[in-house]
């Protein structure tokens, strides 16, 4: 075993008088312990050393124990949102209660924990989900199957997800998101056509920047000449 590659300037040398062979040396350091079991397979004597590392504990469960639980490492795995989710998804294949507090600090892992593991809402993670426009929309549309008021402030920062939230979830106007929608000619036009089904004056300056969307807005919504600030943008042809 090449111990030198783990030396980082701070690592103390093991006392070779106390460690007569490779396995005994490996007990002193998580990296060495994991390297040993990678070569020799599961070893309960080295598990306490491995259980000091979040990543090491997860990889031990996945690759050494062949995707079987590693109870000794669960306490440290539970400190990480990423590895708690992965442990639930790939090892336990069910909820990991001990790790839910950590998962709930991260929007992405909270959403996927709800979607892939719980297959239902994850209230503990909603505060984190609500910080992200995309995951707030996806949580509303795919998990709650209805409005997610806590996430609407984040959703309203995005033209894309404000439009999708209005169209797919609310199935009607999303006033809070109209300012963002109005910055994008595509979503402003489609918001008028497919959501509110009437003129969307706030979005007209953006729509006017694109010929194709001006045509659609004129023909489908206005059904009259499209003027903006006294300037003809598109002539209605009937």
Task: For the regions a language model picked out, list residue spans one by one.
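Alpha-helical scaffold segments
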Residues: 2-238
